[in-house]
């Protein structure tokens, strides 16, 4: 990478003006245990939420390993091991534009689009978008994800994901200290919308 610098511990490629998430590779010959999974997940620094979807999947794998009730240093099943190796490989290719506004010029409006979704494994939220005069620039501002609580209904999890999206937008709005003209909420399922309608 030419002229790399760091922004929030992410590598900044100044020529392409992109941020690249640099994860420590997980050696395929390394033992995959509850201890090594938790250690790897704990070492991931992800303040922008760039890799939240992948870390959520890693946490789900950890939960599945815990369900087997094996010791901390016991090898996980072959299926979980293969899934873990697959997910950690995904972390090597994450790269996003550093700036959402791609044109030099006045920003005429900022619109937050909040996307929320949930399933029985996890729920997540993401926030995007900026508008400039004469064009629309779109990009991911941040994302968050959590492992779903056990025995929760889809309707409840969709509401929780929508609430997380709203809280994320509120915190982001305060941090940016800029006027947001509109907020758009996109819930991916009908369960949460039906509950809100009632």
Feature locations, PLM:
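An acidic- and aromatic-residue-enriched active-site/binding cleft used to recognize and process polar
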Residues: 13-15, 24, 118-121, 128-130, ...
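C-terminal reverse transcriptase regions that engage the nucleic-acid substrate
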Residues: 2-106, 111
């Amino acid at each position: 990478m030419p002229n790399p610098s760091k922004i929030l511990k992410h590598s900044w490629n100044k020529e392409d003006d992109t941020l690249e998430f640099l994860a420590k590779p997980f050696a395929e010959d390394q033992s995959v245990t509850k201890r090594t999974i938790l250690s790897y997940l704990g070492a991931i620094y992800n303040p922008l939420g760039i890799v939240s979807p992948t870390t959520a999947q890693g946490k789900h794998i950890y939960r599945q390993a815990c369900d087997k009730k094996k010791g901390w240093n016991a090898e996980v099943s072959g299926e979980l091991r293969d899934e873990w190796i697959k997910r950690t490989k995904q972390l090597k290719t994450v790269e996003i534009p550093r700036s959402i506004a791609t044109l030099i010029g006045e920003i005429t409006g900022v619109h937050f689009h909040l996307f929320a979704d949930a399933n029985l494994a996890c729920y997540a939220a993401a926030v995007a978008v900026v508008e400039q005069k004469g064009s629309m620039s779109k990009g991911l501002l941040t994302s968050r994800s959590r492992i779903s609580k056990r025995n929760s209904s889809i309707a409840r999890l969709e509401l929780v994901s929508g609430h997380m999206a709203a809280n994320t937008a509120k915190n982001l709005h305060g941090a940016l200290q800029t006027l947001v003209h509109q907020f758009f909420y996109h819930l991916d399922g009908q369960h949460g919308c039906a509950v809100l309608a009632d």
